[in-house]
Amino acid sequence: MQVILLETIKNLGDLGAVVDVRSGYGRNFLIPQGKALPATKANLAEVEQRRAELEKHAAQQLGAAQERAEKLNETTVSIAAKAGDEGKLFGSVGTRDIAEAISSSTGVDVEKAEVKLPHGALRTTGEFEIDLALHAEVTVAIKLAVVPAE
């Protein structure tokens, strides 16, 4: 399935690009979320007419993400979780827990989808470096300390 991208998507393409994607990814994710349109002649013409508006909107989103990154840069967040004697957690600390902790401690809204945990949820106490993908082009690293709850 061919789609026209309405914003820059990492590992896929830039704004206005016509790309081939799997049908399910296009129909169930990109198009409903307003990130793409089906590649028809009418839609191609419409995107060309709206290109300046779309680029302005993309620049605003990038600027907002960079502002959030500046506020979050070098941030250290602490989460208390129940843990055993050896530092192993009873349960885990996931993306939702991390996003809520960052939002409450810094005042900057962070969505759970922006928190990147390449090795899955955290299951031990200690200090970790967590990446936040605030935009396709903006990533910021924060320090997260998981401490045992009293």
From Swiss-Prot:
GO BP, sorted A to Z: translation
Top-level taxon of origin: Bacteria
A Pfam family it matches: Ribosomal_L9_C
Swiss-Prot/TrEMBL keywords: Ribonucleoprotein, Ribosomal protein, RNA-binding, rRNA-binding
One GO MF term: structural constituent of ribosome
Disulfide bonds: none
Gene Ontology terms: cellular component: ribonucleoprotein complex; ribosome
Keyword rRNA processing recorded: no
Function per UniProt: Binds to the 23S rRNA.
Similarity annotation: Belongs to the bacterial ribosomal protein bL9 family.
Protein name: Large ribosomal subunit protein bL9
Gene of this entry: rplI
